[in-house]
Amino acid sequence: MDDDYTRGTRSLPLLEGGFDGRIGLTFLGVGGWLIETPRTQVLTAPLFSNPSIWRTGLGTIRADSTAIVDGLRRFGVDDLSGVTAILSGHAHYDHLMDVPWIAARLSPRARVLVNTTGQRTLAPIADSLGLDRSRIVDVSSFAADVEGGGTWIRLGPDVRLLPLRSDHAPHFAGLTLYDGTRGSDLVRPPRSAEEWLEGETLAFLLEVADAGGGRPVRIYVQDAVAREPWGFVPPRYAPVDLAILVPATYAEVDWHPEAILENTRARHVALGHWENFFAPPSADPEPVAFTLLPDFIARLRRAVSGDDSRWTLPMPGTRLELGRLRNDSR
């Protein structure tokens, strides 16, 4: 199993056409990815505060600014000031708890794109941090599904985003923790994990424009394992070049990752949110509990016909660089 992990930098020859430079993705652990295109930076919601399982279940939890700064530095990121958007498809604490502090202190240009419940949960935290509430945007009404629809959101000169209606698999034995939606703004910051209600989960499709006018690069971001067809892309947007998929809780639904791979026809798969987030951030973490990661990898291998060049299991801090196809001489 240890041989399956990727560390350092991995180059993926996926790009066609006239891209000026590479598209880089740095895995920050849990759901966090820093996605850098030639002209735009986007962050998917990271977690560095990592309260213990006992504190999460029984105590008070909050963002730890020291852990956030140390975690970013540990994984090679020292500047988030250029980030224009922070994405979180649902509002559980392990996705959203650290985001307001990052937006307020490290990413002053970023909009926080969340579901309705996420916006309502973050409202009092934004006030406590001096973060303008207008920067927290509910994108639920922009979402597409497998039948189509939806509205693209511009994130930068070369990047646009399509939210996708998705789902959150049960955590174990058919039970989904912290399920539910929020009908109005919280009046004070959440104190416990159970106050970070999930809301209606979204996935995301990013399109990076080709400077040469060719086909855009498409990156699919799965926020949580979903029952099919939730989280599917409309067929006209397949294939995607890179799909970021979640192994955690895969056994709670049928046909994951097979169904989403059939839908997206992804050329490459990167795995996130696979590690134990009840321990402090580490460059060499253990897999999350209740997930048989070797079994998931075996299923993924079968789904890509045994081609190990088509998937990456990154350790936190790993950087993926999407470059030109080897037969593209331009």
Give, region by region, the residue ranges found by the protein language model.
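Active-site HxH/HxHxD metal-binding segment of metal-dependent hydrolases
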Residues: I53, R73-W152, R160, R165-G174
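Active-site-proximal loop/helix segments of hydrolase catalytic cores
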Residues: R188-N263
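Beta-strand-turn-beta hairpins that frame and shape the catalytic cleft
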Residues: G17-L25, E36-V42, T151-L162, V208-I219, ...
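Short, Gly/Pro- and small/polar-rich lid/capping loops
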Residues: M1-F19
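Pre-active-site segment of Zn-dependent metallo-hydrolases
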Residues: S11-E16, R39-S88, H92, M97-A104, ...
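Active-site neighborhood of phospho(di)ester-bond hydrolases with catalytic His/Asp-centered motifs
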Residues: L43-A45, G82-H92, L113-T116, I219-V225, ...
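Binuclear metal-ion centers of metallo-dependent hydrolases, dominated by the metallo-beta-lactamase
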Residues: R111, Q119, A123-L155, P257-R330
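Extracytoplasmic/secreted cell-surface and envelope-processing proteins
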Residues: H95-M97, L122, W230, A251-W255, ...
